[in-house]
Amino acid sequence: MYPHRRILGLKHHLCILKLLDNINDPSDLKKLSNDQLPQLCQEIRAFFIEKILKNGGHFSANLGVVELTVVLHYIFNFKIDRLVWDVGHQAYIHKLLTGRKKEFERIRKLGGIAGFPKIDESEYDHFGTGRSSTSISAILGMAEAAMLDNKPHKHIAVIGDGSLTGGMAFEALNNLGTSNANVLVIINDNQIGIDPNSGAINHHLNTINEKINFFKTLGLAYEGPIDGHDMNSLIHSLEKSRDVKTPQILHIRTIKGKGYLPAEKAQTEWHSVSYVKIDPSKSNTDNPKPSKFQDVFGHTLLELAEKDQRIVGITPAMPSGSSMKVL
């Protein structure tokens, strides 16, 4: 039925999803015991891998936040609390747990659910995303507005270490450091955006000291780094943060592509998948697709650079996506 299982050696199947079958919204998730959550995460990965390899979509980033997403919805109430996913391509598990499980056959298709959080799609999508480094500013604005209305609920931003290098994220951290807003920023540190990260922030996160670091210098409470796939650690840290009403940073370390070995080994290649990639028999070799704009740009720039040594390429933090890797 699913040729990609044979092609990729996929062993997951959806015959028995004892826990996930009974979860239609976060209220069902909250009925589970802590001990049942690891099994639920296994079932979520099986479901997600099956559906996305069949239908296409953002892949490895979502596998890296399964445990985090489950625990967030287990502890907080996002009908009241607020949650913003930076970029948003890692929000598929969030969608799965918030009443959109049956829509995964039509994800990113006409009439189906979007591949990013979308405000008019669900009451659980609090901010429309799709671009990098906007989450902290957005959640801080919501939290400041809530303070004016005397609403004490939690405001959470999940931002990757790659997105943390964007200028808007620094502007937001600058403001957050002097705010009393009820904000939790979760740094999802997986060492990679679409391509491996670089720069001073990347180095700082790799060598960070819990007592003395960039975030504490800004006046922010910091915890971490903790294992973002360890359910007990996540529950402990997030339950503790729930009772704190001032800005906090929680630094977690995750593996992009967690639970699917090909994606763990080739994280850039498995950032997203398409059905043609999954099943080569479906590709139309008689009518090949035209070259992508970025590929034309990358190869043209290379040709020009070979003739003019003064040309320097500046990548937008993703040499693969911009096709500047050819340089």
Regions found by a protein language model. Give the residues of each.
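Terminal amphipathic helices with adjacent charged low-complexity linkers/tails
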Residues: 229-284
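Mobile "lid/hinge" segments at catalytic clefts and subdomain interfaces of large enzymes
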Residues: 165, 172, 177-202
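Gly-rich Lys/Arg/Thr-decorated short loops/hinges at beta-loop-alpha junctions or inter-strand turns
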Residues: 19-25, 46-51, 114-126, 155, ...
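N-terminal amphipathic, basic-rich helices that act as targeting or association modules
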Residues: 16-97, 216, 225-234, 248-251
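Conserved thiamine diphosphate
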Residues: 149-153, 199-237
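Cofactor-binding active-site loop characterized by glycine-rich and histidine/acidic residues
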Residues: 58-179, 293, 303-327
